Amino acid sequence: DPTSACNLHCTGCWAAEYGNKLNLSFDDMDSIVTQGKELGIYFYMMTGGEPMVRKKDIIELCRKHNDCVFFAYTNGTLVDEALCKQMQEVGNLFLALSVEGEPDVNDMRRGEGVYNKVMHAMDLLKEHGLVFGTSICYTSANYKSVTSEDFIQMLVDKGCRYALYFHYMPVGNAASVDLLLNPEQRIYVKNRVR
């Protein structure tokens, strides 16, 4: 991961435990990709922290290694017009924006106003013709809403081409075990996203 730094402080996120201390230099990231290519690896996933805190370096990495594909999980709040134009230019960076359902449920864990920022980021990415998707953390509070036809249709309408679902794990910043799913809720999600 390029960094442990993040511009948000989401409830239950492990990244908050690391603060802003862990950062790979551009040279380290470049070396990882160079070594990976020697092994035949041309697809790289980035998490964080928030990878877009390092968007300048990530774009440069994409530019330098234009024979590779880079995929980043992002909270979406740092996606702007300039980044979209740079993504068009390099053509090998794809994002999965985190969203967890309706605005109130999403912002309960991620912070006030984050849902609207993510929706704006999706609009920008779509306007620029970029391929992007979403990363959905499902909990006992949102598992039905994030698997509903209406929610999925909203994502399609926004321009999402893929959705990655993963279940909540209570680690990190003010983690709540109340958000864990019981076995029946997990089965419900499995049957909905098949």
Residue ranges, per PLM feature:
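Short glycine-enriched, charge-decorated loop/helix-capping segments at active-site entrances
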Residues: 15-23, 108-114, 178-181
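A C-terminal junction/extension of Radical SAM enzymes
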Residues: 168-194
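Radical SAM/AdoMet-radical enzyme domain recognition
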Residues: 29-46, 54-167
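Canonical Radical SAM [4Fe-4S] cluster-binding loop centered on the CxxxCxxC motif
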Residues: 1-27
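Flexible loop/turn segments at secondary-structure boundaries
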Residues: 2, 53, 172-173
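A short, flexible beta-alpha/helix-coil linker loop
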Residues: 16-20, 102-104, 170-173
